[in-house]
UniProtKB/Swiss-Prot annotation:
The gene is fmp52. It is found in: Mitochondrion outer membrane. Residues 1-28 form a transit peptide. One of its GO terms (biological process) is import into nucleus. The keyword RNA-binding does not apply. InterPro entries: NAD(P)-bd_dom, NAD(P)-bd_dom_sf. It comes from Aspergillus clavatus (strain ATCC 1007 / CBS 513.65 / DSM 816 / NCTC 3887 / NRRL 1 / QM 1276 / 107). This is Protein fmp52, mitochondrial. It is a peripheral membrane protein.
Length: 234
């Protein structure tokens, strides 16, 4: 059975990842590290879930390093917004810096599988700041040399966020409407948060078992159609 550590558990995708992990019989223990208590913690079995809550993110890596037993899978759904961070430079420092720092701590602790929720279009050569940042995160964590790295690149993420993002909410409404007409209209460019979460957990567990596609033994990248396939309800 897997022991899993998770950052980003209070976000839209991360919250669904946590719920999926708690429901999975293949997962023995879940440790979350976050700024606030994940909503799912209120009803989670204490024997399976341990939460570490601190606004001081400089404490997160040492907390991850000290986890016993060592997580066999480390998952990151952590991210922030330009507005919340106070500009893109700060967003980069927080999102890129913390993701890479935590991945390195997990690698050094002996974690075998790393799972990252990235973004469609992520590329360090992108002309746009956000996908370029996502691409740089991907490249930097791949360079750490986990036994297996799993990267999910969803398109627009459909679902309910706690924070207000009016423009994104409008596009999510269009995606939802398109999905009601025909699911294929949406699935190519938008995926539901719970589907992404299930795909992340399923892919992480498969990677731990060594059950990955040929040619993806070290790095396995899942895009829209893969996410839909692995995120389906069993």
């Amino acid at each position: 059975m897997a022991n899993v550590a998770l950052i980003g558990a209070t976000g839209m995708v991360g919250g669904h990842i946590l719920s999926t992990l708690l429901e999975s019989p293949a997962v023995a223990r879940v440790d979350t590290i976050s700024r606030k208590t994940p909503p799912a913690a209120a009803s989670a079995p204490q024997a399976k879930l341990t939460t570490f809550v601190s606004d001081d993110t400089s404490r997160w890596a040492s907390q991850l390093s000290a986890l016993t037993p060592t997580p066999s899978i480390f998952m990151s759904a952590f991210g922030t917004t330009r507005a919340a961070a106070g500009g893109f430079d700060n967003q980069y420092k927080v999102e890129h810096g913390l993701n890479v720092e935590m991945a390195r701590a997990a690698r050094d602790a002996g974690t075998k599988v790393y799972v990252l929720i990235s973004s469609s279009g992520a590329s360090k050569t992108s002309s746009f700041a956000y996908p370029r940042m996502k691409g740089e995160i991907e490249d930097d964590v791949k360079a750490l040399g986990f036994e297996r790295t799993v990267i999910l690149r969803p398109g627009l993420i459909s679902g309910q966020r706690e924070e207000s993002r009016p423009a994104e909410a409008a596009v999510r409404f269009i995606a939802g409407f398109a999905g009601k007409i025909y699911s294929g209209l949406k699935d190519g460019w938008a995926q539901d948060a719970d589907v992404i979460a299930r795909a992340a957990v399923n892919a992480g567990l498969k990677a731990l078992e060594g059950d990955v596609p040929a040619g993806s033994e070290k790095v396995w990248v899942l895009t829209g159609s893969d996410i839909i396939r692995f995120g389906g309800k069993n």
